């Protein structure tokens, strides 16, 4: 099964080797036919503390690194 890759924005870089990434998804509501935006936060592993708050990044699924970390930062995303 392929690993999922998501794009988002770093919302926090306070912890060592960890960033919080907010990923937004858009979908059309089935009844209202209106575009809805939902966001979810993921904690991702950042080995070298490279990324700072506000950076656009791509994250990929990985084996669990800690209690809450299941994602790794893959690369910086183009804005």
UniProtKB/Swiss-Prot annotation:
HAMAP family: Ribosomal_uS17_B. The gene is rpsQ. InterPro entries: NA-bd_OB-fold (IPR012340), Ribosomal_uS17 (IPR000266), Ribosomal_uS17_bact/chlr (IPR019984). GO terms for biological process: translation. GO terms for cellular component: cytosolic small ribosomal subunit. One of the primary rRNA binding proteins, it binds specifically to the 5'-end of 16S ribosomal RNA. Belongs to the universal ribosomal protein uS17 family. This is Small ribosomal subunit protein uS17. CDD domains: Ribosomal_uS17. Part of the 30S ribosomal subunit. Keywords: Ribonucleoprotein, Ribosomal protein, RNA-binding, rRNA-binding. Transmembrane segments: none annotated. GO terms for molecular function: rRNA binding; structural constituent of ribosome.
